[in-house]
Design a protein with these regions (language model features):
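Active-site recognition of the HExxH zinc-binding catalytic motif
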Residues: 284-299
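Short pre-active-site segment immediately N-terminal to the catalytic Zn-binding motif
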Residues: 266-287
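Autoinhibitory N-terminal propeptides
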Residues: 1-37, 43-113
Length: 355
């Protein structure tokens, strides 16, 4: 049962470490820096945590208002609470398992695999950079809530599918950036069919590099790498250290594609995602792109059927163009037909050899 353990503002990092170590039945899934953790634990353990010294709340439902938590992190609380909103739950229940609803997704529906970040296991640090801007690039409060909820649910898909041996835990550092008087949204060209790396970079760098500067990092991919190293070098709430790190940029600034991932970072353009596959699928988009950063391959039309990925050098056997798929393509996150990972993708991200 997923439970959010929230701590009061200003709590020492060691408080969460004590909580996580207090019972072997507690399985952390996500640690949100400065707020607390999403854990899995039996109901009696959750009840005991509510009375644990230094805990503001331990809930399996919505957090009550008025808790003494860090107000800067209220969007994470709002995101958690939105899961329990009846209208949101109805939208989730109504969405189809197949979220890429065309035979060949329009340009920008996904990205390309990155050089290996390493296997998707251990403690993964995720630096989430939301880039707000003026006019058309302005992120509304509801946008930020939806982004944060999308990240939480994306991680939920991955940790639910991961084997126990992977010991997969995500730690999140949120960097909300607002660019003022730096980048005119109208100066950045819009999406382009069949975009190249240069097309993507020429658009992205115009707002990404100022965002990197705002968080104290150099421009370009050296800045992304530097930030990833900083995520690896710090101590997180709960006393944990990350084994690997990735960065995510989410914005309304124009990009060449709606979502893509390479070189240790993923990029999501909110307006394009709203058009396809839709805001309600943002968790699937984020999870899909995260998997790309750990060598997972696309499996829909246009995929590469015989490319080998991951530590087990598994071919892309669930690619719709692979002869093996004529026997029936398995539902899979990388095919856009499921929230779950097929056995081929599990091999690509390093969880198990196929099958």
């Amino acid at each position: 049962m997923n439970t959010l353990v929230a701590l009061p503002a200003g709590s020492p990092a060691g408080v969460l470490q004590t909580i996580l170590a207090s019972n072997p039945a507690i399985q952390p899934r996500v640690i949100i820096d400065g707020l607390g953790a999403v854990i899995e634990a039996p109901t009696p353990v959750v009840a005991a945590l509510s009375a644990f010294p230094g805990v503001a709340a331990a809930v399996t439902g919505a957090l009550p208002a008025g808790l003494p938590v860090n107000p800067v992190l209220q969007p994470w609380i709002d995101a958690w609470n939105k899961q329990f909103d009846p209208a949101y739950q109805a939208s989730l229940a109504a969405r189809p398992a197949k979220w890429l609803t065309t035979g060949n997704p329009p340009p920008g529906a996904s990205g390309t695999p990155a050089p290996p970040t390493s296997t998707l296991d251990g403690t993964v640090a995720f630096g989430l950079v939301t880039v707000n801007g003026p006019a058309a690039a302005a992120l509304s409060p509801s946008d930020v809530i939806d982004i944060n909820l999308g990240v939480l649910n994306a991680i939920g898909h991955l940790t639910r599918n991961a084997p126990d041996a992977a010991r997969l835990v995500f730690v999140i550092e949120w960097q909300p950036v607002t660019l003022v008087g730096v980048v005119d949204p109208l100066s950045i060209p819009g999406p382009i069919p069949n975009s190249t790396f240069d097309d993507q970079e020429n658009r992205e760098k115009q707002w990404r590099d100022p965002a990197l500067a705002a968080i104290g990092q150099p421009a370009g991919f050296p800045g992304v790498t530097n930030y990833r190293n900083a995520l690896l070098g710090r101590t997180w709430w709960g006393g944990v250290h990350a084994d690997k790190s990735i960065v995510g940029f989410v914005s309304r600034y124009n990009t060449a594609m709606s979502a893509y991932a390479a070189m240790g970072r993923l990029v999501v353009n909110l307006p394009q995602t709203d058009v396809f596959p839709g805001r309600i699928h943002i968790d699937r988009v984020v999870a899909h792109e995260m998997c790309h950063l750990f060598e997972a391959q696309d499996e829909y039309d246009g995929c590469a059927p015989f490319v080998m990925s991951g530590p087990f050098h598994a071919v892309n056997g669930n690619c719709i163009s692979n002869p093996l798929a004529t026997l029936g393509q398995a539902p899979c996150l990388m095919a856009g037909t499921s929230d779950d990972l097929c056995n081929w993708t599990k091999a690509h991200v390093g969880w198990q050899p196929f099958p």
